[in-house]
Amino acid sequence: MESSLLNHLKIDNFTTQNGVLYTDFPLSYQFFGQKLHTAPIILVNHALTGNSNVAGEKGWWKTLVGYGSVIDLQKYTVVCFNVAGNGYDGFFIDNYKNFTAKDMARLFVLGLENLGIKELYALVGGSIGGSIAWEMLCEAPHLAKKFIPVATDYKTTDWLHSQCLVQEFLLESKDRPLEKARIHAMLNYRTPESLNQRFKREQDEQKNILKSHDWLNYHGTVLDNRFDIKAYRLMNQLLKTIDAKEEDLLKINSEIHLIGVDSDLHYPAFEIKNSYDFLKNNGKNVYHHEIKSIHGHDAFLMEYEQLNEILGKIF
């Protein structure tokens, strides 16, 4: 069985959409489950502050990916790349505006080629990882037998672009920029109902602040301690530049399963339903699923029982 150690490869002479040449570009990844080329392969793309460690004791999606889980490591080889520049492997990109979501998708496709992977049994991506996956299939329409984008879409809408713009303003702050950006982002990842139901305007008497205030401070501090602002700026740039073309979507040859969240503010449910309608009306083999939750975008990480049930019917 394949280890989950961090592995590295190099992409030679990679030119970004903006025309910037990188002669020797690093890409890191992890394997989980069966030895490569001995079982069907599933690629999982991580979310904005995630990484390649998708399974195992500290795996960010260990409720779905594991031995005996819905994505069963006894049956599959799971691969997960780090978005280049996310810092998990120590690599950062200073000139983050050189890159778009399409560039990262192209790097992932080249990374698969480097590993000798010509076909995936499934391509799964949550949030921005799913958006990068859309761009991957526009580059390589026959890459995956099954495509499962979760809480995501193939484009940066005006709403999402506006959120990214606010993030940029906050990241330019001189005082605690990453902490501020994370606090704002958390309000986009959850919903008013979720926070109101959880905190009920209760005070933390010891700190003399609302418990909701303390919760936001906690999330800001935690990310500030474990994530680098260079990585966050890059990820926000990628989120702002998702731009798969509808004509390219129609070339995708996968069985497509769109999974939305009914209360999502980040990638709203109606946008995912519109994408489903477009693909269905154009004869694509597409299915629509929806997680019911008050928790908004983060429900794709929180409502694991619902997601397990949906994925169980696909795998």
Residue ranges and their predicted role:
Residues 265-271:
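Conserved alpha/beta-hydrolase "acid-adjacent" motif
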Residues 30-87:
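N-terminal cap/lid subdomain of alpha/beta-hydrolase-fold enzymes
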Residues 274-315:
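Catalytic active-site module of serine/aspartate enzymes centered on a nucleophile-bearing elbow/loop
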Residues 143-222:
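Alpha/beta-hydrolase-fold enzymes
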Residues 119-158:
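Conserved hydrolase catalytic core segment
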Residues 102-121:
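Conserved acidic catalytic loop of the alpha/beta-hydrolase fold
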Residues 1-41:
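Catalytic-loop region of hydrolases
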Residues 252, 258-260:
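Short beta-strand/loop motif that positions the catalytic acidic residue
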